[in-house]
Every structure is written in structure tokens, then in C-alpha cells.
């Protein structure tokens, strides 16, 4: 998602101040989900259609592991088990709020009224739960996909690769659940006196 474009400005002049939600609104508008036909997005006016749209918007931050029968969410550089689906439930609430705001961007009066009536049904928690259940197929992941690269060390501030000795920003698609408790430092002047003493002892000073 683009992080350098302007915040999404609604037709009423207000801006969506959260950058991530703003990016999602740009994507929603580009698909025009109210036009559910073969020439457009194809997102049906149904729970299944909303599950498809939710899955497309949140695939970088929410996944359902069938083996563990649990949702996982990505934050602070790692995928973490979402016990009780608390975080993913908040994400679908954000999704519903975005869809309600999007209804105000529909220019055709009749379509806007009809689509608003449909979207408002997602205010019912039972409907949101059913959408999440449908979305498990869209966001399915195998347990073997997690931590599958043994050469990646996930630190608090990024990911270190043992293959090329590089350090980079964390990536959601590394699917790392394990994370160290320390921050990686690239400083060359950091020394461990005890370690150097140990090396000197075992080599008897022959460096």
C-alpha cells in the first residue's frame, strides 16, 4: 500500500487521518464494490462478497491458520496468535466503518441509498462474525508457512539474514512468528570484552 500519497479526503471535506485506513479507502474506491457485475469488481452484495473484499484489504495483517484453528495478526514486526480473535474482530469493525464512509462517496442517489442499506446490516455483530468465518478461506495459511526460512532472525527493529548478513525492515510476507527480545545494532564499534577475552583464552593469544 502506498504510504506517501495524500490522506483520503471524503466528499464532505473531512480526511481519514489514519494512513493505513486512508490507503484502504483508496483501494475500496478503486474497486467500486457497489458495482457488482462482470464489468467491475464482482464483490457481491452479500456476506461472501464482503468477506472477499475484507480478505483482499487485510491479507497483509490477518491470516487464519487451519491447523491451529486460530487467527494470526501481524503487528510490531511479527505474526502473533490472536487469542479469541480479539484483534481481527476490531479490524472488521474498522472495515465496516470504512464501508459506511465509502457509501457517502457513491454519486448515484439510488445506488447510494441501496448500498448504504446493505452496508448498515454489517452493524450487526452476528453478520460480522459470519463474514469473518467466510474470510477464513480468503485468508487461510498453513502452519508450515510460518517461520519457514531458518536463515532469518527477527529482531525488535528489523530482520537479519544469515544468508547474506544483511539487515532490513521486517516484512509481513516472511511470516515470522518468532522474535528476539533485543534490537539489532549495526554499529561497528560495539565490543564484548568478555567474549574477546574468551577467544584470547581458547586460542592462547594466537589470533
What would you call each of these model-derived segments?
Residues 37-53, 115-159:
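Extended, Lys/Arg-enriched charged tracts that mediate electrostatic binding to polyanionic substrates
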Residues 80, 87-142:
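Histidine-centered catalytic micro-motifs used for acid/base chemistry in nuclease
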Residues 1-8, 58, 62-87, 112-113, ...:
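P-loop NTPase catalytic core of nucleic-acid-dependent motor ATPases
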Amino acid at each position: 500500500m502506498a504510504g506517501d500519497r495524500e490522506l483520503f479526503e471524503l466528499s464532505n471535506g473531512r480526511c481519514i487521518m489514519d494512513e493505513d485506513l486512508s490507503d484502504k479507502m483508496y483501494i475500496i474506491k478503486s474497486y467500486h464494490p457497489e458495482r457488482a457485475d462482470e464489468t467491475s469488481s464482482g464483490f457481491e452484495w452479500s456476506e461472501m462478497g464482503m468477506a472477499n473484499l475484507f480478505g483482499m484489504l487485510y491479507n497483509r495483517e490477518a491470516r487464519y491458520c487451519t491447523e491451529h484453528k486460530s487467527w494470526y495478526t501481524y503487528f510490531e514486526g511479527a505474526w502473533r496468535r490472536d487469542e479469541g480473535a480479539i484483534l481481527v474482530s476490531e479490524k472488521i469493525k474498522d472495515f465496516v466503518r470504512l464501508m459506511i464512509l465509502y457509501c457517502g462517496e457513491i454519486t448515484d442517489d439510488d445506488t447510494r441509498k441501496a448500498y448504504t442499506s446493505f452496508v448498515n446490516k454489517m452493524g450487526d455483530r452476528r453478520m460480522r462474525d459470519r463474514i469473518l468465518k467466510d474470510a477464513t478461506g480468503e485468508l487461510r495459511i498453513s502452519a508450515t508457512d510460518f517461520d519457514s526460512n531458518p536463515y532469518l532472525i527477527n529482531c525488535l527493529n528489523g530482520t537479519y539474514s544469515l544468508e547474506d548478513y544483511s539487515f532490513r525492515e521486517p516484512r509481513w510476507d516472511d511470516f515470522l512468528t518468532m522474535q528476539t527480545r533485543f534490537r539489532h545494532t549495526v554499529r561497528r564499534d560495539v565490543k564484548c570484552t568478555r567474549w574477546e577475552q574468551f577467544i584470547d583464552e581458547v586460542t592462547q593469544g594466537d589470533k
